[in-house]
C-alpha cells in the first residue's frame, strides 16, 4: 500500500490520502493508516476504483510540486518519484501557476526547499514525539499551509538530521551533502558508529573512497532507526588535518620520514630504555583488534604491563563485567517504571539512550529522577540535590527515593562517568550494589545497575583487561616517571611533557600529535574493519568503507610491523589470526566469569 505520511515510529496523521483502500459496505475509499482493524472487515487494496483514487491523489500532490528531479538531492531515493511512476500521469491538466513557498532557515545541517513539501508532517511529528523539541509546526490552511520553525531559527535538537531521512520528498535535505553525488553512484557499507558507546548501526556511503554521508540502519535493540547529528555529520572531519605520512621531530619541527626510519628510531629507543619506564595508553576510538595487538605488543615484545585505556582516573572494578556495562540493555529502558540518573546527562553523552528514556516516559509515564539539575532532557524529571550525602542516604535506605526504588518492579539506575570520578565513587558504587542485592532487585531477568560509558572503546578495552588495576599509572605519568610514552590513538591524556619520548599513533593531527616526537599515521574508523563492544556489552563488527590517505596504515598493521622490526617476527600472520586470538582471549574470560558475548 503506497503512503507518504505514515511511519511506523510516528503517530497516525492520515493527511496524504495516498493509502486509500476499498472497504466493503463503505460508500467511499478509506485511509488505511487511520482505519482500525475489526472482525469481519473485508479490505481490497488493489481494485480499479482504488487505483483511480490513488491516481487522483497523486495528481493533486504533483499539481504544485516543482518537478525539479534533475537538480534535487532526493532524486533516486524519493518516495514521490517512485510512486508517481505507478500512479502518476505523463501530462498535467494543471495549467495555472504553481504555488511558491519561501525556504525556511533550519540551521547549518538541514537544507530546505519548501516548494517541494507535500505536507506529510513527518518532520513535525518526529520533532514533537521522538526528539522532544516541538520547534517545527504547520501554519496556514489549504494551499497556504507551510511547515516552519515559527521564529526562523535553527532546530535545537541533537536528532534533527533524522528529519532528512523521514522526508519522503526533497523538501528537507542535508546541507553538507548538497550536489555531492547520486545514490546509485555511492558504495554502501554497513558498519558501526563510534561517536558514542551506544554502537548505533549505520551505513557509510562513499564516492571514489571518500565518505559522503552516514545514514542509520534499523536495529530495534540499539538505535531503532535514528542516529544523532554527531554520528551523521562527524564524517566531514575525515578529510581535515589527516596524518598521511610518518613524522619525526627535529629541533621542534616535524619532518617527513619513511616507515623504516621511524621503526628503527623506535626500536633503538625501546632497546635502550628500562621496560619499567615504558607505558602505553589506548584511545577512545580504537577497535578491539587494534587494542588487543597493542596490549600484546607491550606484553610480549616490550615485556611491560604499563598500559591503560582511561585518560582520567575513574573507579572501575573490572573484575566483574556487570560493574561496567549497561545491564538492563538499551531496549530494557522501555520496561522500567522508575529511572534514576546519577552523574550523567544522557542527552549529550548518549543521545539514543535519551531518546529511549523519552519513549519510556511517553508510553509508560515512567518516573524519572536525576541527582542534580542537568538542564532540558526533553522529558520532565525530578531533580534532587546531588551531593555525596544525598547519594549515601539513598543507598542506605534513608531517603524517600529508597522506598520508591524498593517498591518499583523494574527500577533502572544509570551511572555516569562523572560520578565514577569522585573520590568516594568506590564506596558509593559498592553501597548501591549492596542496596540492590539486599532488596532483591538484581536477578537473572533484570539488573537495574547500568554504567553509561561515553566512548566507543571503553567496554571493549575493559573486556580485554587494558586497565591498570593498581590505579597508579595516570598519577605516575603526571609525575613524569616514564621515559617513553606510546599514545595509541590517545589525545586526552592530561599531563605536562618534560623529557619523555612520546610516540603518537593516530589518524588526525590532534593534541597527541602536537606533543609527540614521532608520529605514526593510522587509519580512521571508516578505514579499517574491527569489532566494538557497545555499552550494553554487545560485540558488533565495523566494516571498512574507505582507505587511509597517503602512506597511512591500519592500526593493527603498524603494531605488527613494529613488532617484526624489533623481534624479527610478527605478532600475527594476518588479521584473521589476530581476530581469532582476540576471541579466544574473550572465551577464556567467558569460561572464567560466565559472561555472554554477543557477536553481530
For each predicted feature, which ranges?
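An alpha-helix initiation/capping motif
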Residues: 10-13, 161, 288-292, 426-429, ...
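N-terminal export/assembly segments and adjacent metallocofactor-ligating motifs
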Residues: 1, 22-26, 33, 40-400, ...
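Non-catalytic alpha/beta scaffold blocks inside enzyme catalytic domains
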Residues: 307, 311-593
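A short, compositionally biased
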Residues: 14-19, 196-200, 592
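Short, hydrophobic/aromatic-rich segments at coil-to-beta transitions
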Residues: 17, 187-191, 499
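Residues embedded in well-ordered beta-strands
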Residues: 18-20, 203, 412
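A basic, amphipathic helix-loop patch mediating RNA/tRNA/ribosome contacts
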Residues: 1-24
Amino acid at each position: 500500500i503506497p503512503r507518504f505520511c505514515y511511519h511506523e515510529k510516528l503517530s497516525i496523521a492520515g493527511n496524504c490520502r495516498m493509502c486509500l483502500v476499498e472497504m466493503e459496505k463503505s460508500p467511499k475509499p478509506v485511509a488505511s493508516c487511520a482505519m482500525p482493524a475489526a472482525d469481519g472487515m473485508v479490505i481490497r487494496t488493489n481494485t480499479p476504483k482504488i487505483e483511480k483514487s490513488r491516481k487522483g491523489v497523486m495528481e493533486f500532490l504533483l499539481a504544485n510540486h516543482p518537478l525539479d528531479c534533475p537538480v534535487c538531492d532526493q532524486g533516486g531515493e524519493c518516495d514521490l518519484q517512485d510512486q508517481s511512476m505507478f500512479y502518476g500521469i505523463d501530462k498535467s491538466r494543471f495549467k495555472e501557476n504553481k504555488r511558491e513557498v519561501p525556504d525556511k532557515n533550519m540551521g547549518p545541517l538541514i537544507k530546505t526547499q519548501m516548494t517541494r513539501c507535500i505536507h506529510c508532517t513527518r518532520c513535525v511529528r518526529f520533532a514533537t514525539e521522538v526528539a522532544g523539541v516541538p520547534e517545527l509546526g504547520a501554519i496556514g490552511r489549504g494551499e497556504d499551509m507551510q511547515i516552519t520553525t515559527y521564529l526562523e531559527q535553527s532546530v535545537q535538537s541533537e536528532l534533527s538530521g533524522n528529519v532528512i531521512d523521514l522526508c519522503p520528498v526533497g523538501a528537507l535535505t542535508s546541507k553538507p551533502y548538497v550536489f555531492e553525488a547520486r545514490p546509485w553512484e555511492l558504495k554502501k557499507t554497513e558498519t558501526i558508529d563510534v561517536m558514542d558507546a551506544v554502537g548505533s548501526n549505520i551505513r557509510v556511503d562513499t564516492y571514489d573512497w571518500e565518505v559522503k554521508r552516514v545514514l542509520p540502519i534499523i536495529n530495534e535493540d540499539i538505535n531503532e532507526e535514528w542516529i544523532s547529528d554527531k554520528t551523521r555529520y562527524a564524517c566531514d572531519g575525515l578529510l581535515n588535518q589527516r596524518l598521511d605520512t610518518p613524522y619525526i621531530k627535529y629541533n621542534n619541527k616535524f619532518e617527513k620520514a619513511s616507515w623504516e626510519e621511524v621503526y628503527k628510531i623506535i626500536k633503538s629507543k625501546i632497546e635502550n630504555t628500562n621496560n619499567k619506564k615504558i607505558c602505553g595508553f589506548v584511545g577512545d576510538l580504537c577497535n578491539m583488534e587494534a587494542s588487543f595487538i597493542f596490549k600484546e605488543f607491550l606484553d610480549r615484545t616490550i615485556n611491560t604491563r604499563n598500559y591503560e585505556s582511561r585518560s582520567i582516573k575513574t573507579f572501575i572494578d573490572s573484575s566483574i563485567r556487570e560493574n561496567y556495562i549497561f545491564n538492563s540493555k538499551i531496549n530494557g529502558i522501555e520496561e522500567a517504571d522508575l529511572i534514576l540518573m546519577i552523574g550523567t546527562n544522557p542527552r549529550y553523552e548518549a543521545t539514543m539512550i535519551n531518546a529511549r528514556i523519552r519513549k519510556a516516559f511517553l508510553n509508560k509515564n515512567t518516573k524519572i529522577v536525576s541527582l542534580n539539575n542537568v538542564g532540558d532532557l526533553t522529558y520532565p524529571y525530578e531533580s534532587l540535590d546531588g551531593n555525596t550525602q544525598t547519594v549515601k542516604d539513598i543507598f542506605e535506605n534513608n531517603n524517600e527515593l529508597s522506598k520508591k526504588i524498593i517498591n518499583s518492579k523494574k527500577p533502572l539506575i544509570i551511572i555516569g562517568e562523572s560520578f565514577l570520578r569522585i573520590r568516594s565513587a568506590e564506596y558509593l558504587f559498592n553501597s548501591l550494589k549492596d542496596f540492590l542485592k539486599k532488596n532483591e532487585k538484581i536477578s537473572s531477568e533484570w539488573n537495574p545497575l547500568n554504567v553509561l560509558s561515553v566512548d566507543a572503546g571503553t567496554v571493549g578495552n575493559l573486556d580485554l583487561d587494558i586497565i591498570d588495576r593498581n590505579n597508579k599509572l595516570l598519577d605516575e605519568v603526571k609525575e613524569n616517571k616514564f621515559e617513553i610514552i606510546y599514545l595509541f590513538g590517545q589525545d586526552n591524556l592530561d599531563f605536562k611533557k618534560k623529557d619523555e619520548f612520546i610516540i603518537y599513533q593516530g589518524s588526525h593531527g590532534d593534541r597527541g600529535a602536537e606533543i609527540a616526537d614521532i608520529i605514526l599515521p593510522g587509519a580512521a574508523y571508516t578505514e579499517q574493519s574491527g569489532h566494538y563492544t557497545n555499552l550494553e556489552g554487545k560485540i558488533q563488527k565495523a566494516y571498512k568503507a574507505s582507505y587511509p590517505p597517503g602512506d597511512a596504515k591500519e592500526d593493527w598493521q603498524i603494531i605488527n610491523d613494529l613488532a617484526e622490526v624489533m623481534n624479527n617476527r610478527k605478532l600475527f600472520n594476518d588479521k584473521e589470526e589476530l581476530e581469532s586470538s582476540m576471541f579466544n582471549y574473550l572465551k577464556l574470560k567467558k569460561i572464567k566469569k560466565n559472561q555472554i558475548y554477543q557477536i553481530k
